[in-house]
Every structure is written in C-alpha cells, then in structure tokens.
Amino acid sequence: MPQVAASSSNVGPSSAAASSASHVQEVAKSASDPPKHTSFSSIGISPMLIRSLASLQIKVPTPIQSLTIPSVLEGRDLVGGAQTGSGKTLCFALPILNKLIKDMVGGFAVVLTPTRELGVQLHEQFVAVGEGARMGLRCALVLGGMDMMKQASELANLRPHVIVATPGRLVDHLRSGGGEEWGLRRCKFLVLDEADRLLTDTFKPELEYLYSVLPSAKTLQTLLFTATLTEQVVEFANAKRPEGKPAPMVCKIEMDTKTPETLEQRYVFVPSHVREPYLYHILRHPPIKPSSERVRKLNAKHQADRERKEENQRKSGKRRRTHHASDSDLDQDDDAALFLPATIIFTARCKTAATLSGMLAELGIPNVSLHSHLRQSERSENLQTFRAQRVPVLIATDVGSRGLDIPDVELVINWDLPSAWQDYVHRVGRTARNGKRGFAISFITERDIDVIHSIEDKINTKLTQLEGLEDEDKILEKLNAVATAKRVATMALHDSQFGERQQRNQHKQLARLKAEKRASKKAKSAGHDQQ
C-alpha cells in the first residue's frame, strides 16, 4: 500500500527521492490505516464546497488530501508529493476556495503549471468546484499558444480571483503593463504544480520575475506539488524563511511498487521489424471488451453518424466509400474499430507517436495523439476528443500525458518499454482504477529483456505472454497492408515538415542563453575593472 508521511523541514540533501526519510520515518504510516480525517468537514472545508464536491461524486478526502489540507488551511507553506490520480489538485484548490469565500478579492491565487494541457485540466477543476458552490468564482486561464490580446482583454475585464497559467505567458502579460489593472499585489497563494519541472533552468528567468512582482514571502503562502522530490524542490523546503514564518510542511504519499490487483499484465515478444502487424492485430482483436457504458455511448453515436451519412448520400445521389490502405487485405468491418476498449499506446518519442497515429488512421482505426510537437490547439482538441470517447485510441508520449488525469482507460499498450520501473507503474496505473478490470500489454524486443526483468523484480509480478497470437502466419498476412500504411504515414510526416518548428525554437532558445551568458560575463568583467 502507499505510505503516508509528513514532516516539517529540514529535508535532507543527497538522494532527492529519499531526502526526507530520516525526518518522516517516525510519523510514517500505511495509507490503509484509518486516516486522521475521514470527511471534508473534519478538515475544515466549507459546507458550500462540500455540497459542490458531493455533486461531483467526491465524498471523502484521499490520503494526500487528508494529510495536506489542514496544514494549508493553517497558513503553512507546503511541499506535497503524490502521483497523478491521487487527488492532489484539490489539495490546493479546496483551501484556496475555502479562504476565498471569506474574501473575494481579485488576484487571490496564482497557479503555475509547466504544460498547457495540465493548465486546462486545473482550470476545469477550479471552475467545476467553484460553480457547484455558487460562490461567483472568476478563474482565468493564461497559456502560451493562445491569442494574447484576447487574454489581456479577458484579464482586464474579468479581474480573476484565480489565475491558472504557464509561467512564460503570465510574465509576458505582466511585462506588457497589463498587470497594473488586474495585478498580483494582493495575491495570497502561489501554487507550483509539477514543481519538479517548474524548478529547473527552463523556467528560472520567468519564476525569478514573478517572485519580484508577487508579495513578499512573509505574506505569500507557497504550495509545491510534485511526484518527485528533486534537488530543487528540496532546496525550496530547506530555504531560509522570513522571521516568524515556520518551515514548510513536507507531506508525501510514497509511490506504491504494486500494480492494481484487477490489472492483467502481459507481454508480446516479437522482433522489432514486425511489431506493427501485431499491434494492428491486437487492436482489432483486443484482449478486453469495452465497458457496457462505453458500448452504449458508442452505439448511440454510431447510429447518429450512420443516419447522418445516409442522409448525405441520399442528398448527393451516390454512395461514398472511405478508402484505407489496401482495403482488400484488411478486416472489412471497419465499424468494429469504433468499438475498441479505451486504449492508450505509450511511445518514447514524438515522431513514433505521430507515425503510429498516421499508420493506424490509414488502417481504419480512429485515434488521436498527444505529444509536444503538436500545437496547443491540436493537443487540447485531441485530449478532449479522447476523453469524450469520440475515438477509442490515444497515442501519447510520457511527457505529453504527464500530470493529466484521463479516466476510464481499459487497455494500456507499452509500444516502447520505459527504462524506469516507476514510469511503468505510472503508465499501467492509468487503467484498472477503483476496482475496475484493466489490461496492460508491453511490446518486448531482444534489447528489452534486462529492463523487463528489472521491472518485474520491482513490482514483484511476473508478466505472462499474451494469448491469441499463436497463428503467426495469419497475423503477418497483414504485413504488406500495414507496411503500406506506415509508409504513407511516414511520407505525410515528411511533407508536413514534422519537428522543424521545435528545432527553430530550440535554436532561438540556445541563442538567447548564449547572449545572456555573454552579457553576464561582460557585467562581471566591468565590475572587476571598477575594483
């Protein structure tokens, strides 16, 4: 079971993952033990918010919520460590809204996130709880990749209580002078979600600027949430505090090395050059059936789509046919592709995700992808499409999907095996939640044998071979069709100049860093000359 631990700083240095061990061990306990707080009312949450939570089917606090919320309500700075799906968003959203009810001032809280997708998700959760409480919450979403002029107008007119933002875009607005109208002078809370990613050199200039315009640390309550206690997070916990301000609480739910009991874990051991036909076969003949609720929704949607298509065909006076790569070589019932279980396929690289997405689309399997080479609007649309069950398959990188809570996943496929066992647990943990049945399949090649053995040792579970793949000749009958689809997808990527925008941005960032380094050296040299 997960381990619950809490301590005040100091947090030790060295190994970040175990950095607080010597200080939290004496109060550590199993999450299966009766929690100190078993209801939201017992931790001081307003009845208005409790009613809102109930309408969202949230009845009792999770272990990390029970552990952190009382300290936040007491006014303590806090470092909270928990995995995706543990309910950590409410660890800061509920205390912020609880205090905001008593003092509805603009610029009350700033919530920073490293990714736009996570920002959208955080904003949705604030709005959902706030609307349910009927408290008149004004929450703004300030992300890069969106119309800055429109954002500036909304900020000025809305005067939001809570701002959910990526650091770069928020700094852009503040530097442009817009912050004078909706500024952060009265800000009470600063939240860094996915703090291990925010407290890196990538975001350092933006964070330093934000610290300079926010109220002093003496009055500002700072909350960090992370899955990993990195060195930078530890430095924050150990940093010198203003006189009279206590050290931050460090609360952590230790990651469980066990996978859910309702999760079936299998492997497919095939040479790398024939993996694609096996993937296609598995998706066409999945080892787990979609839930009855999913089938009901898909049936309704499918019937509506068919009626609309037939109506269009009657109007045009002819029948339309969708062409896929080598249709004669493929299973003819393309309608069945819509009735797949909700599936996430994890890849190691953006290009792999894009190639698989194009290939499967050519083969008649509806899907969307989620990776950093997509534009913000594309990522948001793709994520919403999968969440709304309009397509059955999401192809994602770890970075592209990190921090996102994607419910009701029934099948996880590791196309590329992660090198770290923690990543494996995190991936497969997206299915088999809340006692539901789930299935995880890992593709393994000759190079992955040591890695899979290491993962099995850590999770104390032996993966078994996936059944139903004995007829290799039948599976490889689709080899030509699948190869054609992959070739079409690869050519489409090449024609779209895939990845060139990211390369240009990297070159610009490198040039900026070099310029800053030269300026710093020049300033130091001038200082020495004056001495």
UniProtKB/Swiss-Prot annotation:
The keyword Oxidoreductase does not apply. Residues 69-247 form the Helicase ATP-binding domain. Residues 291-314 have a biased composition (Basic and acidic residues). Residues 1-28 have a biased composition (Low complexity). PROSITE patterns: DEAD_ATP_HELICASE, HELICASE_ATP_BIND_1, HELICASE_CTER, Q_MOTIF. It catalyses: ATP + H2O = ADP + phosphate + H(+). It comes from the Eukaryota. PANTHER family: ATP-DEPENDENT RNA HELICASE, ATP-DEPENDENT RNA HELICASE RHLE-RELATED. This is ATP-dependent RNA helicase DBP8.
